[in-house]
């Protein structure tokens, strides 16, 4: 699309503008690695509160109470099970099923690891959560209490206010980028995967004037959608005609 190409020539991609895109943890055996606090009978430091797509389906965080086993130390190395008797007992109890996973076959010594390495500090990092398959962007702010499941993508930033970033990633501009690159599924659903999210272009916050930064922060906290739309249009220097052409109902027609 012509407008998308113009934006690509004018703005950096998300990860060049102070943001990081990632995906939550895949375990290979959710029935064993995921459960309630009481069901995962391991040491407190060997489990993390887990957030899933179901927990944000209403547009806000409504935690379902699940945890995920964390077989990694803070430095990224696998734990020594002998240091955690409850954890060792739990994985030994489920050893047969855990070892059937492909990741266990490739890592005999680390047979109890999750498919993806867990970085526990992500739990306490404020982030935006985005489900994989949606008809439109579903971007939820999580203020730093949960670790994301593998069906959720996350965006963090040290330069952008996350409420502002949420406003931008929920806008028709972000939708246009996803629609331009994602395969379209039945029912006009799109894939909001990391590879497509990374294609989204945004301004660098530090390049905005002080007055525009202030207005942007105010608009992001407004309950008026028209105010948010007008601000995003200004951030991208879009004409009224270009803005109208990005209407999702037109893009999906």
Segments from the language model and where they lie:
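Polybasic, glycine- and aromatic-enriched phosphate-binding surface used to engage nucleic acids
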Residues: 1-214, 234-236
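Amphipathic alpha-helical coiled-coil/heptad-repeat segments
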Residues: 171, 208-253
